[in-house]
Structure formats: structure tokens, C-alpha cells
Design a protein with these regions (language model features):
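Short solvent-exposed beta->alpha transition segments
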Residues: 53-113
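Short, flexible helix-adjacent loops and helix caps
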Residues: 45, 61-65, 126
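Residue-level detector of secondary-structure transition/capping positions
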Residues: 41, 60, 80, 120-122
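Short, solvent-exposed loop/turn segments at secondary-structure boundaries
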Residues: 24, 64-67, 129
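Soluble, non-transmembrane catalytic domains of enzymes that act on hydrophobic metabolites at membranes
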Residues: 44-51, 90, 159-164
Length: 168
């Protein structure tokens, strides 16, 4: 027979899960996808490749480089390790331009197309730290998202360089 603390813990966990499910059901899909993109941007700026990978489905495919989820995360880890400064900071930055488009499919509301413009810059080091970041490139990312296991994840993406160059 279960003791009172165990039963109480089970009830709290079940209540938390039900509240989370109810609340996320009230938030529009477009908002949830925007939060996903912003979270991936924040993880990139913090130099957290595995954090970026959390926004990708297990069967993710990056079409421009032909990478799966594991390959993309490992590639980001390599770039982040190479670029990291001696003080541990990651100098590359990704900034989402205000213009992005999210279209949830009417025929299959668990899928969506996402287009995001991302400007990549490099923070200045040393004496020129007060100078504005160095512009590297403006890229357009086009991706497909799927709602799975209670959250949105990218299942595929590709990108095009609009200005400058690829940052890595």
C-alpha cells in the first residue's frame, strides 16, 4: 500500500501535467513556435549546441548540408568549441529579424511552415569591445515543424544566404 507522501507526490505530478497540458492548449500554435525559435536563438547565443538540438525532432533533416539532428548538433558543438574565447564566452550572435512567417497547415494542424530571417554577427574582443558587433551575414531559414509529444519541433530546414556569408 502506498504511503501518504507517495500518493501526494503522484497527485502533485499529475496535477502539474494536467495544468501544463491545459495551459499550452490555450496558447496559439504560432506563439508556441515563436517561443521555440526564440529559445533556439538564445541557446545558440549562449553557445549551447544541445539546447539548439532540443528544438529538433528525432527525425530532423537539414537539407542544405544533408545533416540529421545528431550531425547538426555535433557540427554546432565543433563550431562553438572553435569560436569560444579564452574567457569562455561565445562571440557569435544570432538575432532574429522582426519579419518571420509561421503558417500552420489547415489540412493538418499539427504541421507548420516557418520562415525566419536571422542576422549573424561576431562580438568584438579586446580594445574594440565597445564597437558594434561585426556583421557576418543575413540568412533566411525555411523549416517545417511538427507538433509531437506536447510540443513543436523542427523536422526539416534549409537556408539561403541573403547578405554577407555563412557565419560558419
Amino acid at each position: 500500500m502506498l504511503k501518504k507522501p507517495t500518493v501526494l507526490l503522484i497527485l502533485v505530478l499529475a496535477g502539474t501535467w494536467l495544468a501544463y497540458t491545459f495551459i499550452t492548449g490555450l496558447i496559439p500554435d504560432e506563439t508556441q513556435i515563436t517561443w521555440l525559435v526564440e529559445g533556439m536563438q538564445e541557446d545558440f547565443n549562449n553557445g549551447a549546441a544541445t539546447g539548439v538540438g532540443k528544438g529538433l525532432s528525432a527525425d530532423f533533416e537539414e537539407e542544405a548540408y544533408g545533416l540529421d539532428k545528431r550531425g547538426l548538433v555535433l557540427g554546432l558543438m565543433h563550431v562553438m568549441r572553435q569560436e569560444r574565447a579564452s574567457d569562455g564566452t561565445f562571440p557569435l550572435r544570432a538575432e532574429i529579424r522582426d519579419t518571420h512567417q509561421i503558417t500552420v497547415h489547415q489540412t493538418d494542424p499539427r504541421t507548420a511552415d516557418v520562415t525566419v530571417l536571422v542576422e549573424f554577427t561576431r562580438l568584438r574582443r579586446g580594445a574594440s569591445q565597445d564597437a558594434p558587433p561585426k556583421a557576418l551575414g543575413l540568412l533566411q531559414f525555411d523549416g517545417k515543424c511538427r507538433y509531437e509529444n506536447g510540443s513543436w519541433r523542427f523536422v526539416s530546414s534549409t537556408h539561403e544566404v541573403l547578405e554577407g556569408r555563412r557565419p560558419f
